[in-house]
């Protein structure tokens, strides 16, 4: 008889492989459902799972069967409504065909769509599947290599802190069974013979009984001498160093919080950066994020202050660009880091400052960055800042992008457009 021993590590999720295969098979259905969910949800509500419905007709399995061959005679009922070649109209919703939906019906039959739940991680994976930081170039400091420790099974040697208790006890039990099974079988036979002689004494049974008991005592002693746990049984969790092919990247997030930005515009900007921050956290382990808020002056802040501070003022966009340039020179050498920038504004700026923005971008920032994106959140006509940035776009068409947003419903499409994966 064959025995199958499941040695997979995910003992509590043994259907994981089947689930992954199912998700790959119905990828298009799931991506469409995720896209529909994104349209309905707010940005703050992105970080959870979703229920996915797949029509029953799409999950039916093809089968091989015998064709209805041969010759047969059938008598079919006639009708007084249709003739040969007529097309039968589809029954109204809720009657023929059955299926999911509201309302009752006294006719028709069908099958509801198959509904299942995808996890938060799966939802975000489908959401960001086709996105990436453009122009990501691998750069590392010469002579510096990073490693991570990965599980590599088990070893017979290791430090006491890495002992695998379950594996060690299992090995000890197997060894004891292997070394004592023959003796235990002999002992069992002797004990059965001793019990028989004690129950039914015969002539000269006393001598034989003493010999059997002596032999049984020897077997028990031999079995007892087999150690319960031996150094041979000890198993240790084995971890090996695995080199990490990584790219060092930093993303600068610049947001206008001046008085010209009303609350609705600030909310759209916050949502865009929340989505960007979530995307970076989900897709890149080795990336730093620098938050810069600006009005007449710019300041580097933490995540909490960036999104929720109430500070406001006038508008000098170049202050944020100057600060970004200073931080790059101080902390992020371009030959060691992949540098990215994302800026959100309503387009308003102080007189003559737009020319300064163009100069700072073209001379100081764009030669150092891999990619810089600018979104202007306004339904109005563009102003001088947009014109200045159009000049930057002409000078750096491959590493600079700019888009206009008029409302929150355009955030995700514009986001996907800016960070679409590029075909190599």
UniProtKB/Swiss-Prot annotation:
Belongs to the UPF0229 family. This is UPF0229 protein Sde_0732. Residues 58-69 have a biased composition (Basic and acidic residues). It holds the Pfam family DUF444. Disulfide bonds: none annotated. Residues 52-109 are annotated as: Disordered. InterPro entries: UPF0229. It comes from Saccharophagus degradans (strain 2-40 / ATCC 43961 / DSM 17024).
């Amino acid at each position: 008889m064959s025995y199958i021993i499941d040695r997979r590590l995910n003992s509590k999720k043994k259907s994981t492989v089947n689930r992954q295969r199912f998700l790959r098979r119905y990828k298009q259905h799931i991506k469409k459902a995720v896209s529909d969910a994104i349209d309905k949800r707010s940005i703050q509500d992105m970080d959870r799972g979703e229920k996915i419905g797949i029509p029953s007709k799409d999950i039916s399995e093809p089968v091989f069967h015998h064709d209805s061959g041969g010759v047969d005679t059938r008598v079919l009922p006639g009708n007084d409504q249709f003739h040969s070649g007529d097309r039968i109209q589809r029954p109204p919703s809720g009657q023929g065909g059955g299926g999911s939906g509201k309302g009752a019906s006294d006719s028709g039959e069908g099958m509801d769509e198959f509904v299942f739940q995808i996890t938060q991680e799966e939802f975000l994976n489908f959401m960001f599947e086709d996105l990436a930081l453009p122009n990501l170039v691998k750069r590392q400091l010469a002579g510096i290599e990073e490693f991570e420790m990965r599980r590599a099974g088990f070893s017979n040697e290791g430090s006491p802190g890495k002992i695998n208790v379950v594996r060690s006890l299992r090995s000890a039990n197997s060894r004891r069974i292997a070394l004592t099974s023959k003796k235990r079988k002999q002992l069992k036979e002797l004990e059965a013979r001793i019990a028989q002689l004690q129950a039914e004494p015969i002539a000269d049974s006393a001598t034989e009984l003493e010999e059997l008991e002596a032999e049984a005592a020897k077997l028990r002693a031999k079995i007892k001498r087999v150690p319960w746990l031996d150094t041979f049984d000890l198993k240790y969790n084995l971890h090996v160093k695995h080199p990490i092919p990584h790219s060092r990247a930093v993303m600068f997030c610049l947001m206008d919080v001046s008085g010209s930005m009303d609350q609705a515009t600030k909310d759209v900007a916050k949502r865009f950066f929340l989505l960007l921050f979530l995307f970076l956290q989900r897709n890149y382990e080795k990336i730093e994020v620098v938050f810069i808020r600006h009005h007449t002056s710019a300041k580097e802040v933490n995540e909490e202050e960036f999104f929720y501070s109430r500070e406001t003022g006038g508008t000098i966009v170049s202050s944020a660009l100057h600060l970004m340039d200073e931080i790059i020179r101080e902390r992020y050498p371009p030959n060691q880091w992949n540098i990215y920038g994302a800026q959100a504004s309503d387009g308003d700026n102080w007189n003559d400052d737009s020319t300064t923005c163009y100069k700072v971008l073209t001379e100081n920032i764009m030669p150092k960055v891999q990619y810089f994106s600018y979104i202007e959140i306004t339904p109005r006509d563009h102003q001088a800042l947009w014109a200045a940035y159009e000049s930057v776009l002409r000078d750096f068409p491959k590493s600079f992008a700019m888009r206009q947003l008029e409302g929150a419903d355009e955030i995700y499409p514009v986001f996907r457009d800016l960070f679409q994966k590029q075909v190599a």
